[in-house]
Amino acid sequence: EVQLQESGPSLVKPSQTLSLTCSVTGDSITSDYWNWIRKFPGNKLEHMGYISYSGSTYYNPSLKSRISITRDTSKNQYYLQLNSVTSEDTATYYCTSLRFAYWGQGTLVTVSA
């Protein structure tokens, strides 16, 4: 069974960098595509980007100047970094597998001073 688990801070100050980790068990991150998704208050979903089995990345153009997705294959983890956050980045952040078959439980991140 594939399981994903997000971890990271629940509160980030404006202008700071948000860093999240997704730990994957039951599958290798070198054999699939791995997404970051966020759900805003009101339940609007946004696909932020992905990292592929080879390590190549895709970023949502609306975030491209602020986002980075990286990985550590030795830990079977991948990471989200979002720079210069504002209150509009307050959301529940999810890591998911290709075609969204498997989701983490999500982690709520609030951007506030």
Curated annotation (Swiss-Prot):
GO terms for biological process: immunoglobulin mediated immune response. GO terms for cellular component: extracellular region; immunoglobulin complex. Gene3D superfamilies: Immunoglobulins. The keyword Mitochondrion does not apply. PROSITE patterns: IG_LIKE. Keywords: Adaptive immunity, Immunity, Immunoglobulin. One of its GO terms (molecular function) is antigen binding. This chain was isolated from an antiarsonate monoclonal antibody of the IgG2a subclass. It represents a second idiotype family characteristic of the antiarsonate response of strain A/J mice. This is Ig heavy chain V region 36-60. It comes from Mus musculus (Mouse). The lineage of its organism: Eukaryota, Metazoa, Chordata, Craniata, Vertebrata.
